[in-house]
Amino acid sequence: MVKHSRGYRTRSRSLLRKSPRERGAVPSLSRLMVEYKEGDKVVIKINPSVHSGMPHRRYQGKVGKIIGKRGRAYLVSVTLGDKQKVIIVRPEHLVSFSSSG
């Protein structure tokens, strides 16, 4: 038997799928233009049509805090279990925590 591959996007069929109304490759410009400051709380909401700066699927829906900026991307501190993880995420995959509700 051959071992099945476990790539970066395994088991994400329904998680990384857009609804038919949201189809299309271009994220909204307003979502790209948002500037986050250090200390802002954000929700990681992966946009599956944008592959650059995409975090791993385990971070989908997690709330984190902006701790810095690296190029166009942001450094986001996320609690995963009992550990703090720092991930690099582009703004296409972030939503402000206050406006997410």
From Swiss-Prot:
<dbReference type="InterPro" id="IPR001147">
    <property type="entry name" value="Ribosomal_eL21"/>
</dbReference>
<protein>
    <recommendedName>
        <fullName>Large ribosomal subunit protein eL21</fullName>
    </recommendedName>
</protein>
<dbReference type="InterPro" id="IPR008991">
    <property type="entry name" value="Translation_prot_SH3-like_sf"/>
</dbReference>
<dbReference type="Pfam" id="PF01157">
    <property type="entry name" value="Ribosomal_L21e"/>
</dbReference>
<dbReference type="InterPro" id="IPR022856">
    <property type="entry name" value="Ribosomal_eL21_arc"/>
</dbReference>
<feature type="region of interest" description="Disordered">
    <location>
        <begin position="1"/>
        <end position="23"/>
    </location>
</feature>
<keyword id="KW-0689">Ribosomal protein</keyword>
<dbReference type="GO" id="GO:0005840">
    <property type="term" value="C:ribosome"/>
</dbReference>
<keyword id="KW-0687">Ribonucleoprotein</keyword>
<dbReference type="InterPro" id="IPR036948">
    <property type="entry name" value="Ribosomal_eL21_sf"/>
</dbReference>
<dbReference type="GO" id="GO:1990904">
    <property type="term" value="C:ribonucleoprotein complex"/>
</dbReference>
<dbReference type="GO" id="GO:0006412">
    <property type="term" value="P:translation"/>
</dbReference>
<dbReference type="InterPro" id="IPR018259">
    <property type="entry name" value="Ribosomal_eL21_CS"/>
</dbReference>
<dbReference type="GO" id="GO:0003735">
    <property type="term" value="F:structural constituent of ribosome"/>
</dbReference>
<comment type="similarity">
    <text>Belongs to the eukaryotic ribosomal protein eL21 family.</text>
</comment>
<feature type="compositionally biased region" description="Basic residues">
    <location>
        <begin position="1"/>
        <end position="18"/>
    </location>
</feature>
